[in-house]
A protein has these predicted regions:
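N-terminal Rossmann-like NAD(P)+-binding subdomain of aldehyde/semialdehyde dehydrogenases
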Residues: 1-64, 245
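Glycine-rich nucleotide phosphate-binding loop and flanking beta-alpha elements
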Residues: 46, 71, 136-138, 200
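Conserved small-residue-rich beta-alpha loop and adjacent elements
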Residues: 47-109
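Donor nucleotide-activated moiety binding/catalytic core segment of transferases
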Residues: 49-67, 120-125, 135, 234-244
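Conserved NAD(P)+-binding/catalytic subdomain of aldehyde/semialdehyde dehydrogenases
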Residues: 62, 111-198, 244
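Short, solvent-exposed amphipathic alpha-helical segments in soluble enzyme
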Residues: 80-82, 146, 207
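Hydrophobic packing residues within well-ordered alpha-helices of enzyme cores
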Residues: 101-104, 141, 202-203
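NAD(P)-dependent aldehyde/semialdehyde dehydrogenase
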Residues: 172, 182-189, 193-245
Length: 245
């Protein structure tokens, strides 16, 4: 059955949301659906791998993957890449996403008991590290994993560039790019370039309670400071001629 439609996966969703109250049940289901359709489709995997020439001899290494937890199962693609490349993946889960990632690893083990994936116990040696976190976390990673081959990801921001001729469907898709997962993903749009004179309108949508608390606080702060903004009822649009990321 599809994830979220059986008792076991529904129980996992409930526990994941209890552990991280930024998570929403429907967004967890959507994240799993995206992984199944975009990452685990046989045709798409074969097309992806066809873009790379596999060396005749490829030494197997142990790669520690330090996962973020900002959105559901955000670290899965790193796990997939490590295993697909023929290496062993040690998973250091974020406490914010441990419920879902543990469930997925258990499912992988049931499908293929010999899959080279293990949860990091803090002592197992490794040859390389892939780590995702904030810029501050990256500085810590550089010190912690000095002398080890690393691939480190810090803060990321996504932007949208509009020309004023967007269709309602395109604006609806942009709304999803902005507000899905409460805007916490590195691919969530947080800066929009628009021509002068263009006013943006987005349909109202249900947002996470923690997000709404932040929205109300930011709105109250701007009102107290007299800073202009346009209120969508669930988000603030702030016009600026300069930007800083």
């Amino acid at each position: 059955s599809s994830f979220g439609q059986d008792a076991a996966s529904r129980e996992v969703i409930v526990r994941a949301c209890q552990k991280n109250d930024w998570f929403e049940p429907e967004e967890i289901v959507d994240a799993v659906r995206s992984i199944r359709e975009e990452f685990l489709s046989r045709d798409k995997i074969e097309h992806w791998l066809a873009c790379y020439e596999r060396p005749a001899t490829l030494p197997s290494r142990t790669v520690l993957v330090v996962m973020a937890g900002n959105i559901p199962l955000v670290g899965f693609f790193d796990l997939l890449c490590v295993v697909t490349a023929g290496h062993r993946c040690l998973v250091k889960m974020s406490s914010k996403d441990a419920v879902l990632m543990s469930f997925v690893i258990d499912q992988l083990k049931k499908i293929e008991p010999d899959i080279p994936v293990a949860v990091y116990d803090g002592t197992t040696p490794f040859d390389a590290v892939i780590a995702t976190g904030s810029d501050n976390a990256n500085r810590y990673f550089r010190s912690l994993y000095a002398g080890v081959k690393t691939l480190l990801r810090g803060n990321r921001h996504s932007v949208a560039v509009l020309n004023g001729r967007e269709t309602s469907g395109q604006l609806e898709a942009l709304s999803d790019d902005i507000f899905s997962y409460s805007g916490l993903g590195c691919r969530n749009v947080s800066l929009i370039f628009v021509p002068r004179g263009i006013s943006l309108r987005f349909a109202s949508r249900r947002m996470n309670p923690k997000y709404l608390n932040n929205y109300r606080q930011r709105k109250a702060l701007r009102e107290m400071c007299g800073d202009p903004f346009f209120d969508l009822g669930f988000a603030l649009l702030i016009r600026q001629s300069e930007f800083q990321i």
